[in-house]
């Protein structure tokens, strides 16, 4: 897969870890294999992230959006993707976000 899609949310409490795990499990069932592969998560430094390897970052993001549209945390999402062998992110959401990083 050529890209890494990162779905990122701010962390407000340790209870968010359970939410992250549940969201990751949901996402594994929501993204068809031809759209991407959920490859784990990261929690700490004030943020939580889910990583998806994909050749279709926009479509994989839409799959996530469909899966999480009723999830209260969805409104806080930041999403971006980068080449699997690169460091420069292209922001998907929110549109006004200029810089994206994984701490």
Residue ranges and their predicted role:
Residues 22-27, 62-69:
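Short amphipathic alpha-helices in soluble, non-transmembrane regions
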Residues 70-86:
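Conserved short beta-strand edge segments in small beta-sheet-based binding/regulatory domains
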Residues 2-9, 100-103:
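Long, intrinsically disordered low-complexity tracts in eukaryotic nuclear proteins
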Residues 50-52, 83-88:
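Short, conserved secondary-structure transition motifs
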Residues 34-67:
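Short, intrinsically disordered low-complexity segments
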Residues 86-103:
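Short, low-order "capping/linker" segments at domain edges
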Residues 5-34:
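Surface-exposed, low-hydrophobicity interaction/linker segments
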Residues 10-13, 40, 55, 92-95:
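A preference for well-ordered globular domain cores
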């Amino acid at each position: 897969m050529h890209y890494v899609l990162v779905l990122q949310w701010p962390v407000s409490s340790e209870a968010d870890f359970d939410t992250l795990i549940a969201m990751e499990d949901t996402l594994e069932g929501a993204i068809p294999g031809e759209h991407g592969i959920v490859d784990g998560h990261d929690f700490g430094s004030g943020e939580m992230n889910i990583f998806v390897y994909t050749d279709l970052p926009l479509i994989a993001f839409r799959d996530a959006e469909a899966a999480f549209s009723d999830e209260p945390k969805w409104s806080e999402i930041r999403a971006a993707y980068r080449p699997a062998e690169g460091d420069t992110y292209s922001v998907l959401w929110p549109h006004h976000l200029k810089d994206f990083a994984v701490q």
